[in-house]
């Protein structure tokens, strides 16, 4: 069960797409159950279940109309959305469950199935998995990827005690019933093991990763050029809490103190920016320090990474220790460029430190961001930014190797 699936355009589908690509290498063929809300052809390997709220999202969500995965978050939600988030728990996709459930049951009756697998987000996919587990007693793998309750993708969850309490009970039901729980970071695993000790032995970490063929090795630009830093992808359009605004403030402060930074530093932002982000960036664009490229095909976005000396990663700051790592981080590892990571204390900071992947600053602190950029520039001037990673270091993050780990979880359940 993978709600987000092509033709949807989303970084989140890459994990599922590559699992499906490589599972046959390890003896598994899969049939996908997804939504019909975004169109797409139904064929032998893909079932698409109708959902009543598809029309609602098409009317009120520009990303859905454009074939992109709808953002899980919104700032300043309208009345309809606020009402929907109060009544439709755990998410708007809950109306997909009854139709997907019957579609799945028909498929299970017609063919031999060894196990079922559900992919979060949305959390409704896990509720669908829970229903199918109770109906069929087949082994069930629930892939949480990121945290549902502790470090939620949806900021509105923290603002509703009613939803928080209800969804905590739903998470508990999933953890109690799933035969295996897969997560994408050690921090998520540690939290779930502490919260649900009876499930501890059923929790497995399978990180996100990259496809090595997408990242041919390349040398960075010459040191004599300006320090070029690239970011590929969007900010608040895909995750409302992620914002480049503190970065922009830091850069404006640097320019105000020393206009020569416009010749020494250059940022390429390759991806969709909101109107608010574009307005905030305008002065930096006019100064020549910032270039807004807009959305690009994947190959061209990777080319921008390879033309850069360093790569920008932006996560949002939290008042607690973060548990999630943006999937972009692993692609940046493959690009073999140091990472300028902006986030909060937690998993991103931990990964940058443990893998010696680059430098880190808190995402909501323009002063710290400025200091970190200046330190990065000093390293650049000394010729100390070059990164060459041992291929064996990167191999555990290859998509095929990660699929091997998932297949081993499947093997354990099927054989037992």
Show which residues each predicted segment covers:
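Carbohydrate-associated surface elements
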Residues: 36, 187, 206-209
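Membrane-proximal helix-turn-helix segments that form the acceptor-binding/catalytic region
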Residues: 102-105, 124-127, 131-135, 149, ...
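A short, active-site helix/loop in glycosyltransferases that binds the activated sugar's phosphate group
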Residues: 172-202, 349
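Nucleotide-activated donor-binding/catalytic signature segment of Leloir-type glycosyltransferases, i.e.
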Residues: 258-271, 276-302
């Amino acid at each position: 069960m993978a709600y987000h699936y092509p033709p949807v355009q989303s970084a989140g589908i890459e994990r599922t797409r590559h699992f499906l690509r490589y599972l046959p290498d390890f003896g598994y063929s899969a049939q996908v159950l997804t939504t019909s809300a975004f169109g797409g052809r139904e064929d032998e390997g893909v079932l698409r279940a109708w959902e009543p709220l598809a029309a609602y999202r098409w009317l009120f969500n520009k990303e859905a109309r454009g074939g992109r995965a709808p953002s899980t978050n919104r700032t300043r939600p309208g009345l309809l959305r606020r009402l929907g988030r109060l009544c439709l728990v755990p998410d708007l996709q809950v109306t997909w469950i009854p139709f997907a459930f019957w579609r799945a049951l028909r498929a299970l009756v017609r063919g031999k199935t060894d196990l079922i697998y559900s992919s979060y987000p949305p959390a409704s996919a896990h509720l669908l998995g829970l229903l199918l587990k109770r109906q069929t007693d087949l082994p069930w793998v629930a892939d949480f990827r990121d945290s549902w309750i502790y470090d939620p993708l949806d900021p509105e969850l923290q603002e509703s005690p009613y939803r928080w309490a209800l969804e905590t009970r739903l998470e508990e039901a999933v953890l109690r019933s799933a035969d295996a729980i897969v997560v994408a970071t050690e921090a998520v695993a540690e939290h779930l093991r502490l919260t649900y000790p009876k499930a501890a032995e059923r929790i497995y970490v399978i990180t996100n990763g990259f496809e090595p063929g997408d990242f041919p090795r390349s040398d960075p630009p010459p040191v004599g050029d300006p320090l070029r830093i690239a970011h590929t992808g969007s900010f608040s359009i895909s995750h409302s809490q992620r914002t480049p605004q503190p970065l922009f403030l830091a850069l404006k402060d640097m320019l105000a103190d020393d206009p020569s930074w416009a010749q020494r530093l250059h940022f390429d932002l390759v991806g969709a920016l909101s109107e608010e982000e574009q307005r905030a960036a305008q002065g930096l664009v006019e100064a020549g320090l910032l270039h807004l490229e807009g959305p690009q095909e994947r190959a061209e976005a990777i080319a921008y990474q390879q033309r850069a000396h360093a790569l920008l990663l932006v996560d949002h700051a939290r008042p607690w220790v973060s548990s999630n790592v943006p999937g972009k981080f692993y692609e940046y590892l493959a690009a073999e460029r140091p990472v300028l990571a902006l986030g909060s204390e937690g998993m991103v900071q931990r990964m940058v430190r443990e893998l010696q992947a680059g430098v880190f600053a808190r995402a909501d602190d323009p002063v710290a961001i400025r200091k970190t950029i200046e330190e990065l520039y000093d390293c650049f001037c000394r010729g100390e930014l070059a990164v060459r990673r041992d291929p064996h270091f990167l191999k555990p993050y290859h998509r095929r190797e990660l699929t091997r780990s998932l297949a081993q979880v499947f093997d354990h359940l099927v054989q037992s």
